[in-house]
Amino acid sequence: MPINRRTFLHAAGLGAAAAALTGCGGTQTTSPPRPFETAGPVHPSIDFPPLARKLSGSLITPDQPGYQLARRSFNPLFDNRTPAAIAQCRRIEDVQACVSAAAAAGAPIAARSGGHSYAGYSTPDSALIVDLSAMSSVEVNAGGTAVIGGGARLIDVYTALAGAGRCLPAGSCPSVGIAGLTLGGGIGVLSRKYGLTCDQLLSVTVVTADGTARTVSASAEPDLFWALRGGGGGNFGIVTSFTFATVPAPQLTVFQLDFPVGSAPDVLGGWQQWISNMPDELWSKCNIIGGSPPSGTVIGCYVGPASGLNPLLTDLNHRIGNRQPTLRTVAEHDCLDGMRYFAGCSAKSAAECHDQASGNQWNREAFVGTSRILTTPLADPAQIVSVLDGRRALVMIDGLRGAVGRIRSADTAFPHRDALATMQIYLGTSPTGRAAAASSMAQIRDQLTGIVGGGAYVNYIDAGMPNWAQAYYGDNLTRLRQVAQRYDPDRLFTFPQAITSV
């Protein structure tokens, strides 16, 4: 079977970072939630019994069975969070009732789809959590458009679309929610061929701070539609459904090349020149795995058969000095199997790919993460590698350009259209090791800033990111502020890095 990130890093002894080789943290953890460790700040309270009577779904408060599981997000580092209640919404009217109740009380509210916020912003203390996981339908129309509920997980989206012979360019982590991914842009293994997930959006149904359900598009409230295409989850309102254009499901050829320890500078140097010259059909990432010395691996996929990919891999080998990989895997898949390969759950059912399906905790993982943006090829790739020398960390450098770069930065809220790649910094940890991991992550991030600059990807949101608003949004920040002021003048949808807070 193809070697995935999880098996690779377990073999390397890096444990918690295993699944991160393709961008989705997680290995099996079956321990119960940690006890409450902190109490959140005191906020105005919603009168929950009247709200509960308005909902078709459940409203779970701390005194009710199921609260311990319902409050939990993807990352166990946030298992000490104590929301005031979790509203398990089933229809748009439930979401409207929650928004109206929070606005009337002046109480904090947050939407949660997959619960993958790197900073835990979808599970704040003392807030009403609007859990959209039951609003997860995927309907494919005859013309190939797909209407997808705001709570759908990526593995379910891919599975449903495959049944209709369609595909949507999106992320690789199976339990990530379609909402957070799309609202931050949506980088994935098909981005160079088809663009970001948000580039496929035709319309969005969103409940704004006044409780109104709005369906927005390029022709209906276009400023809000623009902001929802890269402006970040948690801002502007709660999205209940998306309408996407999809593409015919392509054949994919996946690959992984692992190179000898000590060759990482040559691997990164060759890869960055290679990906800059590849056709749109080729997507790839270069992973630099910390150690003494660091090592490098290149993974990716090609839209087409192996016969089209193999000459491109030969070119890569030449560019890195004809170093022979210690492992070379090339395998053809249909689109769904290819996405399951990158998700690291090829041997599991769609339900088992969820982080909390039937109580299954197989891919919950404690980690810290952040990002930087690589705008142009590095003059000295060894500088990046040296940052990871002696560290148990991983930098995943995902190639962009192609279709992503053919849309202007001002045309959507996602600002990094001209970038060569995103750089995700990832450290597996534990609740007791969190402070040390966060410190190490910040050191790596800040050292990389001196090499590549201060840009960052909002979907790898980092609570300690310096100059975060400019880093995430660049020249689009002013317009995003204007949209937020128009649709959320009282700052209902707020959190430490909300657009309403700048």
Language-model regions: role of each:
Residues 2-502:
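Soluble FAD-dependent oxygen oxidases
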